[in-house]
Amino acid sequence: MEPNNSFRVDSEFRYTLFPIFYSIVFVLGVIANSYVLWVFARLYPSKKFNEIKIFMVNLTMADLLFLVTLPLWIVYYYNQGDWILPKFLCNLAGCFFFINTYCSVAFLAVITYNRFQAVTRPIKTAQATTRKRGFLLSLIIWVSIVGAASYFFVLDSTNSEPKKTGSGNITRCFEHYEKGSIPVLIIHIFLVFSFFLVFLIILFCNLVIIRTLLTQQVQMQRNAEVKRRALWMVCTVLAVFVICFVPHHLVQLPWTLAELGFQDTDFHQGINDAHQVTLCLLSTNCVLDPIIYCFLTKKFRKHLTEKLYSMRESRKCSRATSETGTEVVVQLKDAPIKSLKY
């Protein structure tokens, strides 16, 4: 394939979409993930962390790494795609974006496999000492992905482009590919195919879990509740993948080909527009991941339910107090003066 020399396309709607969308994700994500860490620190001593809880904490940390860089991207898109911050922050933002994306995929994969083992081999899983394995797998995931992400620290991440007005230049952040670069294409092919391999494994494990749970005989109400939660957990994990990760990786390879100049201009514009939307969807995993924890741990779910109930009762009390106070004021106002004794 020979690259063409099409002009640089842009999707200008992103300069409105990203600041608004990322601001919402930032607020909700920081609140949700900080609360998750607080609950885990309060409810679970470190010695009682089993494999699944270790994976959950690591997934939360990966989400927070991305969330702390969202203000940088908000400033970038608010300034019409002009990186006005120090260059190293562009490298840092790109690095954390990569870490969050693939650490999230990896930890969701090992969480799914853990649940797969618990359903298909419950006795063996219950007897296994999995705490060390949890730490070891987490270490392998972090070292592998952070090692791969270190590429973004040495990469020349910014480039200058003339403004559309014709006066001066703007600085882009991770928006430049050398036309016809085969190494860049190979890297993206590897990432996309690796993702879909992991996704197929996760899909297989979840389908086996669903089938096993649906074919089991439920003899007790408590077991029925456990089964229902397990099914919801499976559906939530699949939903996170389908909503957040699959659209981005479906678009990523065609978009890369267009960026490298192997597609015509009309296709490039359309796929670039789609790519911006999938980037928004990708960021929502930071908000959706904490939902999975509600179905994975009994203590977490109980603590959250108690807090929500307490807040609801507090509002009822406040409203009742307010209404009682109003009634007293009305009664005093209507009472004869002589009946008021001091």
Swiss-Prot record:
<dbReference type="GO" id="GO:0006935">
    <property type="term" value="P:chemotaxis"/>
</dbReference>
<feature type="topological domain" description="Extracellular">
    <location>
        <begin position="255"/>
        <end position="276"/>
    </location>
</feature>
<dbReference type="GO" id="GO:0004992">
    <property type="term" value="F:platelet activating factor receptor activity"/>
</dbReference>
<keyword id="KW-0812">Transmembrane</keyword>
<dbReference type="InterPro" id="IPR004680">
    <property type="entry name" value="Cit_transptr-like_dom"/>
</dbReference>
<feature type="topological domain" description="Extracellular">
    <location>
        <begin position="1"/>
        <end position="16"/>
    </location>
</feature>
<feature type="transmembrane region" description="Helical; Name=5">
    <location>
        <begin position="185"/>
        <end position="205"/>
    </location>
</feature>
<keyword id="KW-1133">Transmembrane helix</keyword>
<comment type="subunit">
    <text>Interacts with ARRB1.</text>
</comment>
<dbReference type="GO" id="GO:0055085">
    <property type="term" value="P:transmembrane transport"/>
</dbReference>
<dbReference type="Pfam" id="PF03600">
    <property type="entry name" value="CitMHS"/>
</dbReference>
<feature type="glycosylation site" description="N-linked (GlcNAc...) asparagine">
    <location>
        <position position="4"/>
    </location>
</feature>
<feature type="topological domain" description="Cytoplasmic">
    <location>
        <begin position="206"/>
        <end position="233"/>
    </location>
</feature>
<keyword id="KW-1003">Cell membrane</keyword>
<feature type="topological domain" description="Extracellular">
    <location>
        <begin position="75"/>
        <end position="91"/>
    </location>
</feature>
<dbReference type="GO" id="GO:0016020">
    <property type="term" value="C:membrane"/>
</dbReference>
<dbReference type="GO" id="GO:0045028">
    <property type="term" value="F:G protein-coupled purinergic nucleotide receptor activity"/>
</dbReference>
<dbReference type="Pfam" id="PF00001">
    <property type="entry name" value="7tm_1"/>
</dbReference>
<feature type="transmembrane region" description="Helical; Name=4">
    <location>
        <begin position="134"/>
        <end position="155"/>
    </location>
</feature>
<dbReference type="InterPro" id="IPR017452">
    <property type="entry name" value="GPCR_Rhodpsn_7TM"/>
</dbReference>
<keyword id="KW-0472">Membrane</keyword>
<feature type="transmembrane region" description="Helical; Name=6">
    <location>
        <begin position="234"/>
        <end position="254"/>
    </location>
</feature>
<feature type="transmembrane region" description="Helical; Name=3">
    <location>
        <begin position="92"/>
        <end position="113"/>
    </location>
</feature>
<dbReference type="InterPro" id="IPR000276">
    <property type="entry name" value="GPCR_Rhodpsn"/>
</dbReference>
<keyword id="KW-0675">Receptor</keyword>
<dbReference type="GO" id="GO:0005886">
    <property type="term" value="C:plasma membrane"/>
</dbReference>
<protein>
    <recommendedName>
        <fullName>Platelet-activating factor receptor</fullName>
    </recommendedName>
</protein>
<keyword id="KW-0807">Transducer</keyword>
<feature type="topological domain" description="Extracellular">
    <location>
        <begin position="156"/>
        <end position="184"/>
    </location>
</feature>
<keyword id="KW-0297">G-protein coupled receptor</keyword>
<feature type="topological domain" description="Cytoplasmic">
    <location>
        <begin position="39"/>
        <end position="54"/>
    </location>
</feature>
<feature type="topological domain" description="Cytoplasmic">
    <location>
        <begin position="297"/>
        <end position="342"/>
    </location>
</feature>
<keyword id="KW-0325">Glycoprotein</keyword>
<feature type="transmembrane region" description="Helical; Name=7">
    <location>
        <begin position="277"/>
        <end position="296"/>
    </location>
</feature>
<comment type="similarity">
    <text>Belongs to the G-protein coupled receptor 1 family.</text>
</comment>
<keyword id="KW-0145">Chemotaxis</keyword>
<feature type="transmembrane region" description="Helical; Name=1">
    <location>
        <begin position="17"/>
        <end position="38"/>
    </location>
</feature>
<keyword id="KW-1015">Disulfide bond</keyword>
<feature type="glycosylation site" description="N-linked (GlcNAc...) asparagine">
    <location>
        <position position="169"/>
    </location>
</feature>
<feature type="topological domain" description="Cytoplasmic">
    <location>
        <begin position="114"/>
        <end position="133"/>
    </location>
</feature>
<comment type="function">
    <text>Receptor for platelet activating factor, a chemotactic phospholipid mediator that possesses potent inflammatory, smooth-muscle contractile and hypotensive activity. Seems to mediate its action via a G protein that activates a phosphatidylinositol-calcium second messenger system.</text>
</comment>
<feature type="transmembrane region" description="Helical; Name=2">
    <location>
        <begin position="55"/>
        <end position="74"/>
    </location>
</feature>
